[in-house]
Amino acid sequence: MAKQHWKGSTLLGPLPAVMVSCGTPEHPNILTVAWTGILNTQPPRTYIAVRPERYSYGLIRESGEFTLNLTPESLTRAADFCGMYTGAKINKFEKCGLTPEAGVAVSCPSIAECPMSLECRVTQV
């Protein structure tokens, strides 16, 4: 089979879908992000890609914090829901039956049902 040459694009995949929690304890939000990964180990750096027109973009930009929650198979439907609807109009934690858990180093909540959560501070936009 001959090697194919394609134009530059977003062709790498599949990428892990994660549920990103943001906002405040009083007004928490969740968005599902597939564009995420590790940038560096020392110092530890990760990234997420969120379009500026998304509701969560403003929340993250304003607070400078978010929590990256690894999504188990049991939360597939919740992850799908959180990727399809805006948190500007509904509380996704309530709609999906998820539990906001207070952050340790950030003010935004994590998702208690997720097996691992990475509390993050924005260093570059």
Descriptions of predicted regions:
Residues 1-33, 37-125:
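Active-site-proximal mixed secondary-structure blocks
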